[in-house]
Amino acid sequence: MKYLAQFPSILAIYCFCLLQIPSSGFPRPLADASDGLDIVKFEQMAYWASLSRQPKDNQDIYKRFLFHYSRTQEPAHPVKTGFPPVHPLMRLAAKLADRRMKTFWRRDSRATAADFTKKDYTATLGRPFFLFRPRNGRNLDFDTW
């Protein structure tokens, strides 16, 4: 019974706290929200305001990227007109192939036409016959065979 005597005072304090006094600084969460659309509008406005305050870093980075990669750079070597632009290693490969063919034709000038037309297979069994020099870098001496 002791607890029932305190019940009306607790109920009075609870009801007093629930009263919405406009002059007090307590927030009233459900007083102005008529529907959920107002909350969505406020969230969108807050998001837009935060985006508009940020610096324009993305645009600056994009402008720097375009400026850097759109400039024409002066080539280090003279460019031949009429040829499409090619990677320098591809030019080097063409030069190496030309050099290989030149050495092949110089070596071939020492050989006679009879060397290519002979049908004696026993003479060529003792020594290997290469059109180009071997891949391991050694030069063949036909005199030592």
From Swiss-Prot:
GO BP term, pick one: neuropeptide signaling pathway
- Family the UniProt entry places it in: Belongs to the NmU family.
Q: What does this protein do, in the record's words? A: Implicated in the regulation of circadian rhythms through autocrine and/or paracrine actions.
The entry's protein name is Neuromedin-S
Q: Which residues form the signal peptide?
A: 1-25
Keywords attached to this Swiss-Prot or TrEMBL record, sorted alphabetically, are: Amidation, Cleavage on pair of basic residues, Neuropeptide, Secreted, Signal
Q: What compartments host this protein?
A: Secreted
